[in-house]
């Protein structure tokens, strides 16, 4: 007969045998409350906005480049209208600056910005697809209105999808039509993802206590296993959720403080985060107006050195002195003053149409401004042709008057037809070329017999008479 001690031990073993099957995680195999799935919906919705944000950013960049091109064209038009003045030279400097800024912006758009936005869109769309598929499985896995994988806030009832919401929470589970929209960063920040559950569920924080959900366990008791538990844990939602192959609650990956890595179980989350934080947008220096002094603006110093000073590596003081000739200073205020003159410059009414604005600052669009610029360039070309034709007789007469003696006095730069330079000569290197002198004399005689020349320039015809040269100059 067993002793009292043995009887008590036997009774304890019987009780333990009855209790052990219950001593599993009370959250295992149970449905998920709204506290768990709502943040996933919020991330999904924000990822859905990434293609819209990309379109918004790319269009903004293109618009800024177009504005720079328009500014360059307006300045060029102003220079043509005011041809021959220092204001025109200032406008050429302005035009060159904006043309170079436009090129810089276009290069940034092609080489950097477009690649960034496409990468961010691709990684965000992929991650969204993985999240949406998981949420869709949770939504559909239910036994009744009170037992399933996706439960309401209290865990009392399963939730349903209506339009673009689940249980009243915005959660479309699909991509929206792509329309430009300013990008947001509410749930996907610089450090990681904001608001997602990030700890094991030890106290039924996001698992319900009685709603069954086979997607929450890898065990064969009310889980994904059949005759036995799964061979290993299963990851879901692109590595965010890990379903154990035992009767324990799911665990989730902490995503609020990510590190750059490769090959991680939650790699899609890392890739989308990396791509998003790498975005520079259309606010970088290539797309912004410059507030530096005139010499510090893109392209200005190089143009002044090469076109005006004709001297590379010029001193800063030399460049500033040269700029003062055209801007009355070298600070940003003088630049702004020229831009104001350009903006207020009127153009011919026939170029823009009746009852349309005629000030340059009110005109935009590459096609319109290019046409206006072509008009004024043709007009300038016509005026220049008039002067060229007027100058020919005087030039011919000067050439015809050259003698051996006058040629002998010229240096190499002055020695021009009908004079001829002889490098090997010892003394008189510039001499009169008799054959060339005869040709000049014949041409001069021919010009003297011709009354006038009819030349067409721009849209106007100019009748060239043998009038004094000073009259032609008045055309400017």
UniProtKB/Swiss-Prot annotation:
InterPro entries in alphabetical order: Trypano_VSG_A_N_dom, VSG_C_dom_sf
- Gene Ontology cellular-component terms listed: plasma membrane; side of membrane
List keywords of the entry alphabetically. Cell membrane, Disulfide bond, Glycoprotein, GPI-anchor, Lipoprotein, Membrane, Signal, Trypanosomiasis
Which superkingdom heads the taxonomic lineage of this protein's source? Eukaryota
Q: Does the keyword Cell membrane apply?
A: yes
- Subunit details: Homodimer.
Role noted for this protein: VSG forms a coat on the surface of the parasite. The trypanosome evades the immune response of the host by expressing a series of antigenically distinct VSGs from an estimated 1000 VSG genes.
Query: What is the name of this protein?
Result: Variant surface glycoprotein MITAT 1.2
């Amino acid at each position: 007969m067993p002793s009292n001690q043995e009887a008590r031990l036997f009774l304890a073993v019987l009780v333990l045998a009855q209790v052990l099957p219950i001593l599993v995680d009370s959250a295992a195999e149970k449905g998920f409350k709204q506290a768990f799935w709502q943040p996933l919906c919020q991330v999904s919705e924000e990822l859905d906005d990434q293609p819209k944000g990309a379109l918004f950013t790319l269009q903004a960049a293109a618009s800024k480049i177009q504005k720079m091109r328009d500014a360059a064209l307006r300045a060029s038009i102003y220079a043509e209208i005011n041809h021959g003045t220092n204001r025109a030279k200032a406008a050429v400097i302005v035009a060159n600056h904006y043309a170079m800024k436009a090129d810089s912006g276009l290069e940034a758009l092609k080489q950097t910005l477009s690649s960034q936005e496409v990468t961010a869109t691709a990684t965000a769309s992929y991650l969204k697809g993985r999240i949406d598929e998981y949420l869709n499985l949770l939504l559909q896995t239910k036994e009744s209105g009170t037992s399933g994988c996706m439960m309401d806030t209290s865990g009392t009832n399963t939730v349903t999808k209506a339009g673009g919401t689940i249980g009243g929470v915005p959660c479309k589970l699909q991509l929206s039509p792509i329309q430009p929209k300013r990008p947001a960063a509410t749930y996907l920040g610089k450090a990681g993802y904001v608001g997602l559950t990030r700890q094991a569920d030890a106290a039924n924080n996001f698992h319900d206590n009685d709603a069954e959900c086979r997607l929450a366990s890898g065990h064969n008791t009310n889980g994904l296993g059949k005759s036995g538990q799964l061979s290993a844990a299963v990851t879901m939602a692109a590595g965010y959720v890990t379903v154990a192959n035992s009767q324990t609650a799911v665990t989730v990956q902490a995503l609020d403080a990510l590190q750059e890595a490769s090959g991680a179980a939650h790699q899609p989350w890392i890739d989308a985060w990396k791509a998003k934080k790498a975005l520079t947008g259309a606010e970088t220096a290539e797309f912004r107006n410059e507030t530096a002094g005139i010499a510090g603006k893109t392209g200005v110093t190089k143009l002044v050195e090469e076109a005006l000073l004709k001297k590379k590596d010029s001193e800063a003081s030399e460049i500033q002195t040269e700029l003062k000739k055209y801007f009355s200073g070298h600070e940003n205020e003088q630049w702004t003053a020229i831009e104001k003159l350009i903006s207020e410059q009127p153009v011919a009414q026939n170029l823009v149409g009746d009852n349309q604005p005629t000030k340059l600052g009110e005109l935009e669009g590459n096609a319109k401004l290019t046409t206006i610029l072509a008009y004024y360039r043709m007009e300038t070309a016509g005026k220049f042709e008039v002067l060229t034709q007027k100058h020919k007789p005087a030039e011919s007469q000067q050439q015809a008057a050259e003698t051996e003696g006058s040629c002998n006095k010229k240096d190499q730069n002055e020695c021009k037809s009908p004079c001829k330079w002889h490098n090997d000569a010892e003394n008189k290197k510039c001499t009169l070329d008799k054959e060339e002198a005869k040709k000049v004399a014949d041409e001069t005689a021919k010009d003297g017999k011709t009354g006038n020349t009819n030349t067409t320039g721009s849209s106007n015809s100019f009748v060239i008479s043998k009038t004094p040269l000073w009259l032609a100059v008045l055309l400017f």
